[in-house]
Swiss-Prot record:
GO terms for molecular function: mRNA binding; structural constituent of ribosome. Belongs to the eukaryotic ribosomal protein eL24 family. This is Large ribosomal subunit protein eL24. Residues 96-122 have a biased composition (Basic and acidic residues). The lineage of its organism: Eukaryota, Metazoa, Chordata, Cephalochordata, Leptocardii. It comes from Branchiostoma belcheri (Amphioxus).
Amino acid sequence: MKIELCLYSGYKIYPGHGKRYARTDGRVYTFLNAKCEASFLMKRNPREITWTVLYRRKHKKGQQEEIQKKRSRRTAKFQRAITGASLTEIMAKRNQKPEVRKAQREQAVKAAKEKKKADQVGKRKAPAKARATAPKTKAPKTVKAAAPRVGGKR
C-alpha cells in the first residue's frame, strides 16, 4: 500500500483517494481533494493557509517536543534552621554517634509508652462512672408519609 503526500496541504493520500494533475510541461502533481487543487491553481501560498501542514510547521503548532527542551532549574542543597531547632542543634544531633542516638530513641519510646499506659488507665475509670449514672433510652423515629403523586402519565 503506497501512501502519497498532497503537494499543497501536506496530508497523507491513501489509495483510492486524491487527484492527479498533469501540466502540459510534463510535471504531475498529486492533491488530496478539489479544495487543495483549486487553491494550488489560484496560486495561494500554503504557508499562509491555516489548515495546511506547511502553515502548522511554520507557526510551530502542535509540537510537544519543543516543550520538553525547556530546562528545569537544578535543586541546590541548602542547610538552614527549622522552627524549634537551630542549625547548631541540628548539626550536633547529626554528628552524634549512632549508639548515643539509639539510646536516646529507646528512652523516648519508653517514656511515650508509659504515658500511653497511664492515659488508658485513666480512660478506663471514667467510662465506668458514666455508664452507671444514666442508661439511654431509644426515641422512636417518625416516618414521613409519601406525598401523593400529582398529574403526569406516570
